[in-house]
Amino acid sequence: MGKHEFLTPKAIANRIKAKGLQKLRWYCQMCQKQCRDENGFKCHCMSESHQRQMQVFGQAPDRVVEGFSEEFLDAFLTLLRRAHRHSRIAATVVYNEFIADRHHVHMNSTRWATLTEFVKFLGREGHCKVEDTPKGWFITYIDRDSEQAVKARLKRKRIKSDLAEDERQERMIARQIERAQQSMGKTNGELGDDASPDGSEGESGSADEYSDSENDHEGQEEDAKEANKAAGKIAIALQRAVPGPKVNPLDDKPKVKFGFEEEDEVSARDKEKEELAKKKGKDAINAAEARRSALDELMKEEEKAKERSNRKDYWLCPGIVVKVMSKSLAEKGYCKQKGVVKRVIDKYVGEIEMLESKHVLRVDQDELETVIPQIGGLVRIVNGAYRGSNARLLSVDTERFCAKVQVEKGLYDGKVLKAIEYEDICKIFH
């Protein structure tokens, strides 16, 4: 029987059928061929081209199914992004729009057997926000387009620049502290040299004393010669009896002494030196204590400045474990359940992936709580002076609702914070 004419009703009906969606059971995904009836599908399965495609499938079935699954996922998300980008819509509506294209990848050739299984996969992978309602599954596309990626990149760049500025200021303050400590050590060493009993002052004092005694001897000799020239022998005898002193600069005290008065003067001078050394030592100690107190005050002021600059009214950050406390989500079983912050939106809203169900929720930070790990666990400091640093939990004070942590890595590596509030630290997800 020949073909129908171009404008006959039968030819028109055939063209309409060719454009529309035929029965799913008569479609061959490997050959991407739609048959109109059972007889045509049977003939296609017996064809040589179909047999070759089935041999290819038999060599690597998992790879073929995975390829069809990726194509199905990409096409479905493309349709959802273009048609329902910012709306909450039923999954069946989107699926019906998707299969309206006769060249779409059929679901029975993918690794998902049902639409419900595919929707759960979208929620687990974070492609969509998934809600199970009495009317069925509803999905909302999570927009991760280039515009938001650019905004996130600019935000990360701004945060890095702020952190770099803070690190520069902290290095400058650390250098100032080192210089202050070095100057304190130098002043202490100079004061110790001045107060030592074997110093230059003792040597100069003995030399002056020797010169005075020598001048006195010369004056006495000249007077004796002018008064009585005949008594020269007596003067010579006196000079021999009282010889001039031999000065050794290493000796502490002069060896020449003239009676008890000079001994008293020497002892008084020694006492004055000791008192002066003690006074200088006390002054040095007081000066060192004053410098230390000034240094402590400087460090406290710097700590307060960091606290003021890093204390914010938002604390969410990716990678931490939080507890959902929203009463509106209690009916769905999410209340008091833990999840991981995957992304932060506008500083105050977080995308939370629940640990048990793997569902992705958007929750405000007011309806979230921080999670404290066991002793020895890693935490992130989410607010306060050391915001953004990782630390290890050392102990917990349940009466004061605070914890003791030790900062790890970074500029403050090894610093111990003795009392940090529960709200300022949160468990890190491993």
Curated annotation (Swiss-Prot):
Zinc finger residue extent: C2H2-type: 28-50
Molecular function as annotated in GO: double-stranded DNA binding; zinc ion binding
Acidic residues composition bias: residue spans: 209-224
Annotated spans, C-terminal subdomain A: 319-370
A biological-process GO annotation: DNA replication
Compositionally biased spans, kind Basic and acidic residues: 261-278
GO cellular component: nucleus
Renumbered residue ranges of the record's region Winged helix-turn-helix (wHTH): 51-160
Motif (Nuclear localization signal (NLS)): 155-158
Gene3D superfamilies: 2.30.30.140, 2.30.30.30, DNA/RNA-binding protein Kin17, conserved domain (1.10.10.2030)
Sequence segments annotated as region (Disordered): 179-230, 261-284
Domain of life: Eukaryota
Keywords, comma-separated and alphabetical: Coiled coil, Metal-binding, Nucleus, Zinc, Zinc-finger
InterPro entries documented for this protein: C2H2-Znf_KIN17, DNA/RNA-bd_Kin17_WH-like_dom, KIN17-like, KIN17_WH-like_sf, KN17_SH3, KOW_KIN17, Rib_uL2_dom2, Znf_C2H2_sf
Region (C-terminal subdomain B): 376-427
Disulphide linkage map: none
Coiled-coil features, chain-numbered ranges: 147-183, 283-312
Pfam families attached to this UniProt entry: C2H2-zf_KIN17, KN17_SH3, SH3_KIN17_C, WH_KIN17
Subcellular location: Nucleus
Family (UniProt): Belongs to the KIN17 family.
Name of the protein this chain belongs to: KIN17-like protein
